[in-house]
Amino acid sequence: MSDHAVNTPVHAARAHGHRAPRAEFYVYFAVILLGAFPVAFVSWIVSTIRHRRLPKRGPFASAWFDAKAITPLIFRA
């Protein structure tokens, strides 16, 4: 008989879910951040002019948020 409790989905999820980010992840993150910053800056300027008040997030925070959301999607694919 085989032991089915050894590689349960719970153990597999724990083993693969908490990997330490590698250098490749940081390189992709930096490239995406550098690409997202000009777009976020223009968007921030347009929003400031349009609404006549400063948005809650600045352009760097917005670009950081976008890079933080996009980079893991690349590694999951």
Swiss-Prot record:
Protein name per its UniProtKB record:
Protein PufQ
Can you tell me which family this protein belongs to?
Answer: Belongs to the PufQ family.
Q: For this chain's UniProt record, which GO biological process terms are given? A: bacteriochlorophyll biosynthetic process; photosynthesis
- Any one Pfam family here would be PufQ
Q: Tell me, in a sentence or two, what this protein's role is.
A: Required for bacteriochlorophyll biosynthesis. Directly involved in the assembly of both the B875 and B800-850 pigment-protein complexes.
The question of whether Protein transport is a record keyword is answered with no
Q: Which gene encodes it?
A: pufQ
Query: Which species expresses this protein natively?
Result: Cereibacter sphaeroides (strain ATCC 17023 / DSM 158 / JCM 6121 / CCUG 31486 / LMG 2827 / NBRC 12203 / NCIMB 8253 / ATH 2.4.1.)
The taxonomy runs: Bacteria, Pseudomonadati, Pseudomonadota, Alphaproteobacteria, Rhodobacterales
Check the record and name the InterPro entries matching this protein: PufQ_cyt-su
